[in-house]
Amino acid sequence: MATRKAAKTKANGPAHVPSGPSQVLAVVYGTLLLVYLRFIFSAGITHDPAKVMTQALPGLLLLHMGYCVVVLGNKPGRKIGTDVSTAMIAAALSVFFSVIIFGLLVLFGAPAISLVHNTFVCAMHMSILAVLPLFFTYHLDSKVWADIIAMRRPLDHVYAASVCTLIGAWLGAIPIPYDWDRPWQQWPITILAGAYLGYFVGTLGGIALELTKSLCSKTKKTE
């Protein structure tokens, strides 16, 4: 009975429980993404959102793949070539998944005709941020993905960052309808910013939750 319970707990837990150094690197990387977002704004996103977001895609993709290989794939005895291959597959799947996110954006009110390029490129940014690390960490395990979609998966910082990326993008849409006549209110600049900020907040929140669980577990063992 105890063996079955332990096996069930392991199956429902995160695929990769990060060590202290990995958690620190995850926070550093989240901060780096905020710097990258600042770079996107300084590149003139308010003048030509579609062009600047498109030009920023390769950099984001390389950054996220590197993060997956160096931080999320940092496991003893695992070859880096395996992690690189997994990251490439995850990247391809995230690009494909951007079509679904594009559909969701349109469903929630995104311009379906006039600003298709803007919407689709924004969907690609969101998919790379939210989906690529999930595919890298959890692969194509149907049971795990059923738990992720149903929000039954225990939160680690990878899952939390993905969820908060989508929440941040949703919250980012709030300023757009207001009649403030600000350049940054163009579609979908605030949604893009919300996604990046959400990723950072989710990473911090997920790590805080991991540390809390670890501390509680150690406390119970000492009692």
Swiss-Prot record:
GO biological process, one term: GPI anchor biosynthetic process
Chain ranges passing through the membrane: 25-45, 52-72, 88-108, 120-140, 158-178, 189-209
Pathway(s) per entry: Glycolipid biosynthesis; glycosylphosphatidylinositol-anchor biosynthesis
Subcellular location: Endoplasmic reticulum membrane
Gene Ontology molecular function: mannose-ethanolamine phosphotransferase activity
Domain of life: Eukaryota
InterPro entries: GPI_biosynthesis_protein_Pig-F
Coiled-coil regions listed in the entry: none
Alphabetized Pfam families for the sequence: PIG-F (PF06699)
Any one Gene Ontology cellular component term annotated for this protein: endoplasmic reticulum membrane
Membrane topology per record: Multi-pass membrane protein
Keywords on record: Endoplasmic reticulum, GPI-anchor biosynthesis, Membrane, Transmembrane, Transmembrane helix
Predominant localisation class: endoplasmic reticulum
Function text: Acts in the GPI biosynthetic pathway between GlcNAc-PI synthesis and GPI transfer to protein.
Similarity annotation: Belongs to the PIGF family.
Protein name in the entry: Glycosylphosphatidylinositol anchor biosynthesis protein 11
